[in-house]
Amino acid sequence: MSERLSEISRHMRELRDAIELHNIRYYELDTPTIPDADFDKLFRELEELEQRHPELITPDSPTQRVGIPPLKAFPQVVHRTPMLSLSNAFTEGEVEAFDRRVRQSLGIAQVEYAVEPKFDGLAISLCYENGMLVSGATRGDGYIGEDVTLNLKTIRSIPLGLRAGDGSAEVPAFLEVRGEVLMLKADFERLNRQQREKNEKTFINPRNAAAGSLRQLDPCITANRNLRFFAYGIGVCEGGNVPHDTHSHLLDYLSSLRFPVMRERRTVTGVAGLLEYHHEINGLREQLSYDIDGTVYKVNELEYQEKLGFVSRAPRFALAHKFPAQEATTELLGIDVQVGRTGALTPVARLKPVFVGGATVTNATLHNEDEIRRKDVMIGDRVTVRRAGDVIPEVVAVQKESRPSNAKPFVMPEHCPVCGSRTIRLPGETLTRCTGGLFCPAQRKQAILHFASRRAMNIHGLGDKLVDHLVDNAIIRTPADLYKLGLAALAALDRMGEKSAGNIINEIEKSKDTTLARFIYSLGIRNVGEATARDLARYFGGLDRLMDADVETLQQVSDVGPVVAQSIADFFGERHNREVVEQLRAAGIRWKEGAGTQTTDHAAGSAHPGAAAASSKIAGRSFVLTGTLPTMSREEAREKIEAMGGKVAGSVSKKTDYVVAGADAGSKYDKALELGVALLDEAELIRLLQASQADNSSTHVDPERMV
């Protein structure tokens, strides 16, 4: 043997060893370390070398068999006819060559093909005797598989007994049905979520989840994994009225026996029909409920299939046309941190460019710090990247055996990479967040939109597009800048005339008169909704007391627990946020101070923040609003009641003191009558508010415009 031939032989041996290793990881361990596309490259390289040097083919070469030996944990089953795999095509030219070979072999001008999506699942065989399921096996190496009958019987889409749906099909004495076991995408996501909650191993993709679930020694585990089965053909058949003309009629027959078959299947003519179908299914790929990795073409006439026959490991009459790889391996060059509109910090992998899913990918999401730790991702690793359709590319696995010695762990930054504010991660949350909500450039648009929203400062006309214009043109940076806007600057914007600009300026000016609860809510403090903002305003009565409160004091407020208290303390503990709050006050925003219930030191001469509410006829009373009031909106009525220390509930109960009813009052009005709860109309509510306001005047607190 020449030196060059020896080198080729050595390389082929390395390829065989590598393919066998990856086969074991893929089929036995269900923990693949390389994407399918990389495996296909290794296999095709070995095939090409064997075609050029047939004298170097060995009996144990992976090209000479279909899969791998079965697991020793399951009994072995010898297939009555081999379960061969299909030859693959990756380009349109290879599909054209396949069609040409078929036509030339058959001596005909055009061929009709049965076509269907290619499942990305686990091939199995089901054997029925006199209509009853007696055994089921995996493909294994194509000749010997694993007996997984008990596990297969837990899959509800597999018939345990055969009967024709329309009465026309005759059940054979023996029937071997071949198909694919798979897991739907939604079930895969649910399974991985459950695995993470139990701190157990997660699966890379639905195919591996299906394989791992089917090979469980305990059938109860398989039963809980919600696997599905689809039939795609018949192996052996004895008796019955099974069609003998076309493959498509065979599938119709299986469907009549109540086997699930692919709905997207059809017949096409010629190579143009094959390629058109392939493009169509590729476009539908992300809409399907299950994973597919290509399309399958089979000569439809069964007589032609028999004439074409088989090569050593695949039929000549069929072809699998693969889609562009959705997974690929590349080097992780670094991890950058992006800040979203809500302040969430997201680690993003910076990658050596790699072509995957039909596009060149340079960045991929790592989701959060916990995911990085769970996957043990380090800078410098070789990683598997997945890109499916419009889904954001993500790092799904690490090739730890290839980890370089200089690989570096990732640490989430303690300060926001955009604005420099402190970052926090609250207990029970997976996301780290920037605390500079009012100041951070990454959060500007969201912060301003929330500030101006109807239930916050209620600035009509300040919508998404206008805020985009104002921020993108650096006209405003924080909510406080809204109160510095001039008519000329606004009117100069696209599609914004002087009249529209004047209306918005008036709305901004009107918003200066508000309530403390609305103002607190407008700041966008994480975990502080409208109800919590009202509780905080009622308890502290003034903004300074709230801003200076520590976590322990904050937890004295009704329904404020440790997480919410920490959010509030962190927000006001950030210098940038306090600066914006002071700018807002300086702009003229005002509200009534003093309607709190916090106890203070009277001996030191400080005013009692709860004095106003304490003497109010409304304080502590429970109200329910129903129907349409003549002059007030329900939101306005709520604010006036709460400003005097009252509470507004959503439903009527025995604890309700008053039901305020307007026009078209519904079931709440009826419930009040049934329970004997006092009913008020708007005029009576206003008189009650005025009486409470008069009582409060003796406390020397100056409430602004109560009614």
Swiss-Prot record:
- Its Enzyme Commission number? 6.5.1.2
Please give the SUPFAM superfamilies that the UniProt record associates with this protein.
BRCT domain, DNA ligase/mRNA capping enzyme, catalytic domain, Nucleic acid-binding proteins, RuvA domain 2-like
State the Pfam families in the record: BRCT, DNA_ligase_aden, DNA_ligase_OB, DNA_ligase_ZBD, HHH_2, HHH_5, Nlig-Ia
- Occurrences of domain BRCT (ranges): 613-707
Recorded catalytic reaction(s): these are:
NAD(+) + (deoxyribonucleotide)n-3'-hydroxyl + 5'-phospho-(deoxyribonucleotide)m = (deoxyribonucleotide)n+m + AMP + beta-nicotinamide D-nucleotide
Keywords on record: DNA damage, DNA repair, DNA replication, Ligase, Magnesium, Manganese, Metal-binding, NAD, Zinc
By its UniProt entry, which PROSITE patterns does this protein fall under?
Answer: BRCT, DNA_LIGASE_N1, DNA_LIGASE_N2
**Record GO terms (molecular function):** DNA binding; DNA ligase (NAD+) activity; metal ion binding
Positions of the catalytic residues: K118 (n6-amp-lysine intermediate)
Record-linked NCBIfam families:
dnlj (TIGR00575), PRK07956.1 (NF005932)
Q: What is this protein called?
A: DNA ligase
Q: Species name for this entry?
A: Nitrosospira multiformis (strain ATCC 25196 / NCIMB 11849 / C 71)
UniProt lists the gene as ligA
